[in-house]
């Protein structure tokens, strides 16, 4: 079923139209309207940087907005907002998991975030070496190259 067919069969004429957005957050919950979104947005910006997150939020359209909202509330608000693990540990876990998944662009983003969260270059290197054992040499080679690029971009290594 395509999106248009789904929309036509799932729309109800008796439903209220969505409230008009003030434009302050491009269709996302207004500040204070969703505490989980607010918490997630703050954590996301702290780790990934204001510029990257603002670009993602501003670029969202009707098709991508639900995913951006879910990422902000669920991944960042619920996941990163859970105090059981400190941000530094979460960053190291993400580096290992992104290595396993061979997601180089996302890895670069999280390497920069790891530095913001207090992970040292030596710890990033150790995580990549550990991941090599369980994820394999090809994944470790790609991830190490991506991590090096990210670290050079932010001046963490020469």
Spans of features found by a protein language model:
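Short amphipathic alpha-helical surface patches that mediate protein-protein
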Residues: 112, 129-132, 148
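Substrate/cofactor-recognition hotspot
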Residues: 130, 137-141
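Acidic, glycine/proline-rich low-complexity segments that act as flexible tails and inter-domain linkers
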Residues: 2-88, 116, 142-158
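Alpha-helical scaffolds flanking conserved acidic
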Residues: 86-92, 121-126
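Mid-chain, well-packed structural core segment of small domains
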Residues: 100-125
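Short alpha-helical scaffolding segments that buttress acidic/His motifs in well-ordered protein cores
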Residues: 71-75, 92-99, 127-132
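Gly/Ser/Thr-rich beta-alpha loop segments that engage phosphate groups in nucleotides
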Residues: 51, 104, 138
């Amino acid at each position: 079923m395509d999106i248009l067919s789904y929309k036509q069969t799932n729309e109800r004429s008796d439903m209220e139209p969505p409230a008009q957005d003030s434009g302050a957050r491009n269709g996302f919950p207004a500040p204070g309207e969703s505490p989980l979104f607010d918490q997630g947005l703050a954590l996301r910006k702290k780790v990934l940087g204001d510029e990257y997150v603002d670009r993602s939020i501003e670029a969202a359209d009707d098709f991508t907005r639900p995913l951006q909202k879910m990422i902000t509330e669920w991944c960042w608000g619920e996941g990163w907002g859970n105090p059981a693990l400190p941000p530094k540990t979460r960053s190291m876990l993400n580096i290992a998991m992104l290595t396993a998944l061979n997601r180089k662009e996302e890895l670069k983003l999280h390497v920069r975030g790891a530095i913001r969260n207090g992970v040292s270059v030596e710890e990033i290197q150790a995580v990549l070496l550990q991941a090599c054992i369980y994820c394999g040499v090809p994944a470790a080679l790609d991830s190490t190259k991506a991590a090096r690029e990210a670290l050079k971009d932010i001046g963490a290594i020469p």
